[in-house]
């Protein structure tokens, strides 16, 4: 009969024993550099120009697109559960709204500016972030103003984007988050806010490291923002471009960004760590994008993972990599999970 062998080995070194440091649930909490809290979460809201809309997004489980008349009833229970911040994305659906320069982006009667004012009135403690981009509002679906040959006109684009950011701040947004990835827009936004007397009370949260990739499909379904021709590879970062990302992080920090977003997040934890080092004095925000969210739901539906466990694992990974904030479609679930 075979018997188990045990090697005769030297006694274990003192420095090799780690398990005594995490054998108890409280110890495991103490060993966590950052623990997920409600005040770290930012919830994306899609606001359309159809006032009574409440349309589920098929590719984004549990997420809807809302008109202004449906917004308060949806947000109120989330605020009561501890929601502290939202990021607004406007979705113009009415015929004839879009044009080559995204005029509707900062229309005072448009969905975003209406939503800013409504949410500030109904929920004074809720922190309002506005995504700043033109893609939802341009007839061509690109993030800036184009030359006749279809390439980005940098100067006109950043001038337009800065104007939109300033108008959101004038309407009451606490924070503007430019997501266009067009060179130099942080500097122009900051200058615009200074000129408007708003820089002292408007946080500029830059999508400094936003990569071109395959994980934005459900968002584009929700925001109706797919390009009508071409793609965004000439202004969003290439997936393997770590050096470019590091340069973009340093640039936006130097241009006056108050915080940094890394997007997507799961496949870019190295960039998040880079951001926490290059921009060490700024809050780093992970954007858990629509495709990442949808993938976790799909895996859970197949029985491959437990949804709650994998959501926590992914988000705790962002914190471990250096994030302090997370834009997450899981925010409503986390508000319940973190309460229980």
From Swiss-Prot:
Alphabetized UniProt keyword annotations: Heme biosynthesis, Lyase, Metal-binding, Porphyrin biosynthesis, Zinc
Binding site for 5-aminolevulinate 1: 220, 232
Transmembrane portions of the chain: none
Active site (record annotation): 210, 263
Keyword Acyltransferase appears in the UniProt entry: no
PANTHER family reported in the protein's UniProt record: DELTA-AMINOLEVULINIC ACID DEHYDRATASE
Name by which UniProt lists this protein: Delta-aminolevulinic acid dehydratase
Organism: Candida glabrata (strain ATCC 2001 / BCRC 20586 / JCM 3761 / NBRC 0622 / NRRL Y-65 / CBS 138) (Yeast)
């Amino acid at each position: 009969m075979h018997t188990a062998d045990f090697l005769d080995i030297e006694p274990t070194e003192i420095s090799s024993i780690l398990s005594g440091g995490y054998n108890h649930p409280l110890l495991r909490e103490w060993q966590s550099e950052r623990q997920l809290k409600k005040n770290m979460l930012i919830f994306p809201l899609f606001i359309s120009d159809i006032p009574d809309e409440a349309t589920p997004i098929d590719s984004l489980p549990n997420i809807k697109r809302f008109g202004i008349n449906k917004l308060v009833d949806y947000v109120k229970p989330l605020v009561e559960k501890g929601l502290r911040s939202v990021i607004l994305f406007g979705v113009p659906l009415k015929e004839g709204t879009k044009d080559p320069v995204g005029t509707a982006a900062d229309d005072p009667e448009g969905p975003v500016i209406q939503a800013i004012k409504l949410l500030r009135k109904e929920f004074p403690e809720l922190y309002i972030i506005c995504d700043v981009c033109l893609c939802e509002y341009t007839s061509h679906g690109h993030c800036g103003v184009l030359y006749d040959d279809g390439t980005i006109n940098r100067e006109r684009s950043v001038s337009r984007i800065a104007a939109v950011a300033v108008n959101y701040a004038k309407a009451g947004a606490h924070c503007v988050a430019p997501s266009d990835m067009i060179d130099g827009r942080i500097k122009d936004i900051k200058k615009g806010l200074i000129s408007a007397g708003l820089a002292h009370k408007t946080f500029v949260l830059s999508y400094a490291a936003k990569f071109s990739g395959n994980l934005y499909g459900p968002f584009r379904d929700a925001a109706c923002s797919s390009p009508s021709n071409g793609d965004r590879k000439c202004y969003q970062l290439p997936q393997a471009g770590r050096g470019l990302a590091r340069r973009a992080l340093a640039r936006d920090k130097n241009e006056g960004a108050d915080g940094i977003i890394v997007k997507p997040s799961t496949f870019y934890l190295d960039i998040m760590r880079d951001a926490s080092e290059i921009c060490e004095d700024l809050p780093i925000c992970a954007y858990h994008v629509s495709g990442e969210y949808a993938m976790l739901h799909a895996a859970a539906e197949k029985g491959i993972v437990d949804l709650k466990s994998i959501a926590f694992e992914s988000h705790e990974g962002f914190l471990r990599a250096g994030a302090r904030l997370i834009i997450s479609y899981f925010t409503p679930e986390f508000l319940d999970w973190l309460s229980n």
